[in-house]
């Protein structure tokens, strides 16, 4: 292979362009990698769990507590409904006794 022998201004410009690209492209990629690294660090800070329990476990616990509370409220409504029905039946029975008497 013959060595590069610049004998015109175009050859010198080409040589300078190749030298410039040889040093600038890796520096450009390094700069972009640093920028992405800092962006990734910021994202990691937002995503990483900084407390003792996982959010999913906390939400599951809250869901279970709400389900338990719902059952208690439904039982209370059922008891109130039964009390109202019992009172209604007693009043109807009392009215019947008054009519017979």
UniProtKB/Swiss-Prot annotation:
InterPro entries: DUF2746. This is Gene 30 protein. It comes from Mycobacterium phage L5. The lineage of its organism: Viruses, Duplodnaviria, Heunggongvirae, Uroviricota, Caudoviricetes. The gene is 30.
